[in-house]
């Protein structure tokens, strides 16, 4: 908000609450509660070693939004999104006690592609304001048409990756067929 992106949105917490104080507290409380809950789950399941994978993802998520030059303002914003969401899937896969293999990798790619496709799908209407705020998002760099094409391609890739995850993970036959037809 301080950097000018999304300032035109009238329903933002910053505008509704006349400043960043409430939004900052909301972020601190949400982050603290999520971290505590996640740590309790890892302790209960005796999988604290997953913190070795999860902690860098948390730091990457923080850097995406905070600091003097957030990653969301750079050309790395979309990559950071994909790495974080793919990594979260991998952590959840490991937490479920499944061995990391081709199915996990396909699922991580699916989550990453879904996340980036969703991010890209929201960028075209914000090109002018993002450019004015100094953001270097994919849409600012490549324009509306290319952004939409890439978002659709990532969505299709995500569906194929998810089907591969289901197939490789043991859901064969009718379940995978129904999912494939629905996609």
In which residue ranges do the predicted regions lie?
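Hydrophobic alpha-helical transmembrane segments
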Residues: 24-28, 50-55, 79, 104-109, ...
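Membrane-embedded alpha-helical segments that form the functional core of polytopic membrane enzymes
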Residues: 50-62, 101-121
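Extended hydrophobic alpha-helices typical of membrane-associated regions
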Residues: 167-183
């Amino acid at each position: 908000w301080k950097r000018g992106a999304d300032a035109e949105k009238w329903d933002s917490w910053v505008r509704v609450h006349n400043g960043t104080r409430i939004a900052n507290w909301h972020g601190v409380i949400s982050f603290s509660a999520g971290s505590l809950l996640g740590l309790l789950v890892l302790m209960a399941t005796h999988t604290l070693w997953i913190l070795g994978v999860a902690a860098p993802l948390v730091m990457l998520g923080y850097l995406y939004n905070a600091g003097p030059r957030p990653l969301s303002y750079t050309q790395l914003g979309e990559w950071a999104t994909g790495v974080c969401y793919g990594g979260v899937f991998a952590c959840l896969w490991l937490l479920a006690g499944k061995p990391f293999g081709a199915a996990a990798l396909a699922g991580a790619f699916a989550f990453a592609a879904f996340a980036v496709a969703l991010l890209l799908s929201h960028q075209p209407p914000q090109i002018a304001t993002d450019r004015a705020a100094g953001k270097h998002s994919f849409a600012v760099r490549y324009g509306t048409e290319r952004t939409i094409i890439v978002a659709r391609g990532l969505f299709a890739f995500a569906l194929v990756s998810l089907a591969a995850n289901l197939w490789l993970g043991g859901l064969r036959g009718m379940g995978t067929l129904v999912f494939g037809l629905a996609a």
